[in-house]
Every structure is written in structure tokens, then in C-alpha cells.
Amino acid sequence: MARVWRRAQFTTGGASGAIALIALSPVKLPDPLPVSRKQHGMPDDSENAEAIALVTRDRSEDPAWFVDQVVTPFADLIASDLGPDVAASALATEHAYVIEGEVEDPEDLGHVQAAWALAKCLCEQGATLVVDVYAARAHLGEEVAALAPDRELEVMHEVTLFFDETEAGTLAAWSLGLRKFGRPEIVLLDIAPDKATETALLLRDIAATLVAGERIEPGDGVGVPDGRRLVAERFDPASAPVVSIEGDALVLR
């Protein structure tokens, strides 16, 4: 039986945690799904798991809408993560299974576990890939099917770190996926190219702290290994157009 993922450093007052996964399949999958708490990792001691819902979308119902609204928005992401052949197969898929849920200020992460439990079951039944919408990442179906049902939370499975070059020649770095945990995304700017690895580790560690339940508010300070103290501010997308974030975000300066 899967133990619910609890947040060891949970601090109340956060936002709602939302997750959205889209599983694509070339074939119609069983309804109802043969979901097993033991086999798929569905937690049984979390009310948050009950917030997750599954909706089926079939290409045959409205082919143009299916392509425009379900598949095409993620084609570039799938191609980048999994290659052009997988992206081409995704564009031709016949069925999409949308897993969604939202929990107010989640004290445990049962909603995240439940979503992946459904995705694992779908992939065992024939889904070929899963898009993690808020983390902007695509996973092969065979990899999702292989997820251990009793695994511990792995932050870097749930959160993606991105880097891009700015017009000034420096780097911008940001997270995607913290929305699942009711926390703002984190942005770091004006990074020297030779500090990319160091910055990735810092961003990973900050993300892990937020996933564990800590909060960062505008005006809060965050200590970094080199002794500096960065201060959190609301992120203005116009200040760094290369940063692609929808929703709440903080920049640390």
C-alpha cells in the first residue's frame, strides 16, 4: 500500500495545488480502469486524492477540436523531450485521458500521487505517453508504467528547471511544476554562463524546500551557498521575456 506523501515542513497559507496530466493512447482503454491501490500507488489515507478526476476525449467526437485543443498545443514540447517520431505519433493519436485536480493549500500530496497512479494504470493499459502540463514535460508511457507504486516523492520528477539566454548574454533560470504544491515558481536572472550548474543546484534545492511545504513571500530573504542573501520579489514577465511562466512566480535577486 502506498503511503501518502506528507510535507515535513508544511506552512499554512499557501495557494491551491493543481495538477494536470494528459495521457495519449492509440487505442480505447478500459472503462472503468482497473486501478489498484497496491499496484498503482493510489494512497488510501489522503482526502486530497479524492480531488482527482479523469475525463476521456476522443478524436472521433470532434477531430478538429481534438487536434487544435488537445494535441497541437503540446507537439513542440513532445518533440523536444521525446523526439520528432513520438511527436508525430502523438499528433495522430485517437484518445486522450485528461487527469486533473486542485486542492486548497495541500498539507499532503495525495492529489499528486493519485494523478500519477491513474497515469500509471493508463500506461499499463496502452497509453503511449503522458504530458505533465504544469511541469511542461513529456514522459514515455513505458516509463510511467514502470513507476514504483511505493516510491518516495522525487522532486525532479515533478518540477522541471529551464535555462535560456537573455539579450544581455546572461542566463535566466526558472522552475515549472511548483503549482502542483501551491507554491509560486522561482526565477533567477543575470546568471553568468559559467554558473549554470551552480544555479541549477540552487534552484533545485529551493524547489525541494517549497515542495516540502515551506513558503517564500515577497520581501523574504533566501540564503545561498556563497554567502549572499537573495530577496524575493513578484516576477514581472516583461522584465525577462525569455522566461515562460503562466501564473504566480517570484524572482530572487
Which residues fall in each region the model found?
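Internal, hydrophobic cores of structured domains that mediate oligomerization or house catalytic pockets
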Residues: 63-164
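N-terminal low-complexity, intrinsically disordered segments
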Residues: 18, 24-88
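Charge-rich interaction surfaces and accessory domains that mediate macromolecular binding and assembly
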Residues: 2-28, 36-37, 234, 243-245, ...
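Aromatic/basic-lined ligand-recognition segments
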Residues: 134-253
